[in-house]
Amino acid sequence: MKSNKKSLRHFITTMLFILLLTFANNTFARDYYQIKVYNIKNAEQEAQIENYLKMAYIPAMHRAGFKTIGVFKPIADDPAAGTKIFVLIPLSKVSDIDLIEEKLSGDKELQTMGKAYFDASFDNAPYERIESILLKAFSGFPEMKIPELATPKSEQVFELRSYQSSTEKIGQKKVEMFNTGGEIDIFKKLNANPVFFGEVLLGKDMPNLMYMTSYKNVESNQQLWQAFGNDADWKVLSAKEEYKNTVSHIDKWLLHPTDYSDI
């Protein structure tokens, strides 16, 4: 009898440990993101990339189990208009990158629908270069959130920003400013509809972080930044000595989602 009770206690203890471990893993799990940037030089390349993404790549990603792929183009007034197309791919783990390559390489429909893209000649390439960026979500914003914007996609604005830092250590202070300093909370409070915040693990502008916010239109974006600059919490946070000079360069793009974007 004592042996049975001891075995039962051991079983219960083991199950509790497994449950707690599972809970901990789920609690601290963070998304990864791949951002692919197609650099283009003219309307012909833009049309080629859009046709490939809409008719071949996005459907293939859906078949591979990746259901939420964002595709964005700079708005007409953005300096990058007509020169870039951004593709945002949320990942649950880094190994998903290998899984995507494995799934897509065996997708015959992708090869058929994307034939013009894959078989493009050396003197008529559909793009100039492709840039790939890998990010890990901030602990203070571990999962991507798809905004609910009550306007047509043609009016919606997604702002993508990249903050570079002078050194890795200084860059970590800027990440800290978002995570525990309260900068993410300010964005939430002001209804900036954050999509993601992430630290760049691989990319050409490291050390840097990137994040995306969203708005129903251009005017809402402008109003947000005016309110942000005047916010009392931001004034206190930005005045802290430990966070000064944590950003050495900022890149920003105002983007519209395409009509076939999942975000």
Functional labels for PLM-detected ranges:
Residues M1-R9:
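N-terminal secretory signal peptides that target proteins for export/translocation
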Residues N26-Q111, A116, A120-W234, K244-I263:
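Short S/T/G/P-rich N-terminal loop/turn motif that feeds into the first structured element of a domain
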Residues I12-F23:
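Bacterial N-terminal signal peptides
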Residues K6-S7, F17, V94:
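Generic alpha-helix initiation/capping and coil-helix boundary signal
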